[in-house]
């Protein structure tokens, strides 16, 4: 078998990291009560009895705002590494990032014009 000097601590950490959740799950199975009766069958909703059904329909406006948020959040995830390495990448990477930002600005203008960002 091959030897990896210096990785003993890492291997120990991996063993502990795997053992702790397994130990917690096994302890839960052993210690927890088995039957579900009375209060345990009720749905918990902020300490009160639940009112209404669980399948309510949200207004589509929430989905539109969430979609726009996710788009610009992903844009940030893509642009952050580019901004960190900006000095080393050169002009071509700058032009590519500019095209990427332009496409997203056009998409934002389109959503704005279609009224996707208006609440009323």
Swiss-Prot record:
Family annotation (Gene3D superfamilies): NADH:ubiquinone/plastoquinone oxidoreductase, chain 3 (1.20.58.1610)
Cellular component GO terms held in the UniProt record: NADH dehydrogenase complex; plasma membrane-derived thylakoid membrane
An annotated GO BP: photosynthesis, light reaction
Physiological role: NDH-1 shuttles electrons from an unknown electron donor, via FMN and iron-sulfur (Fe-S) centers, to quinones in the respiratory and/or the photosynthetic chain. The immediate electron acceptor for the enzyme in this species is believed to be plastoquinone. Couples the redox reaction to proton translocation, and thus conserves the redox energy in a proton gradient. Cyanobacterial NDH-1 also plays a role in inorganic carbon-concentration.
Root EC class: translocase
Membrane topology: Multi-pass membrane protein
Localization per record: Cellular thylakoid membrane
Enzymatic reactions: a plastoquinone + NADH + (n+1) H(+)(in) = a plastoquinol + NAD(+) + n H(+)(out); a plastoquinone + NADPH + (n+1) H(+)(in) = a plastoquinol + NADP(+) + n H(+)(out)
InterPro entries noted in UniProt: NAD(P)H_OxRDtase_bac/plastid (IPR023043), NADH_UbQ/plastoQ_OxRdtase_su3 (IPR000440), NDAH_ubi_oxred_su3_sf (IPR038430)
Family named by the database record: Belongs to the complex I subunit 3 family.
Record-annotated disulphide pairs: none
Record-listed E.C. numbers: 7.1.1.-
Species, as recorded: Prochlorococcus marinus subsp. pastoris (strain CCMP1986 / NIES-2087 / MED4)
Record GO terms (molecular function): NADH dehydrogenase (ubiquinone) activity; quinone binding
Keywords: Membrane, NAD, NADP, Plastoquinone, Quinone, Thylakoid, Translocase, Transmembrane, Transmembrane helix, Transport
Gene that encodes the chain: ndhC
Self-association state and partner proteins as the record states: NDH-1 can be composed of about 15 different subunits; different subcomplexes with different compositions have been identified which probably have different functions.
Membrane-traversing stretches: 10-30, 64-84, 89-109
Entries under Pfam families matching the protein: Oxidored_q4
Protein name: NAD(P)H-quinone oxidoreductase subunit 3
């Amino acid at each position: 078998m091959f030897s990896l000097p210096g990785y003993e601590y890492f291997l120990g950490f991996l063993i502990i990291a795997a053992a702790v959740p397994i130990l917690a799950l096994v302890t839960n199975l052993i210690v927890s009560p088995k039957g579900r009766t009375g209060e345990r069958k009720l749905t918990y909703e902020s300490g009160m009895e639940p009112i209404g059904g669980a399948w309510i329909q949200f207004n589509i406006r929430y989905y539109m705002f969430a979609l726009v948020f996710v788009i610009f959040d992903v844009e940030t995830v893509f642009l952050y590494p580019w901004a960190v390495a900006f000095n080393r990448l050169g002009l071509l990477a700058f032009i590519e990032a500019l095209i990427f930002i332009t496409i997203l600005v056009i998409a934002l203008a389109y959503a704005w014009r279609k009224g996707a960002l208006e609440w009323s």
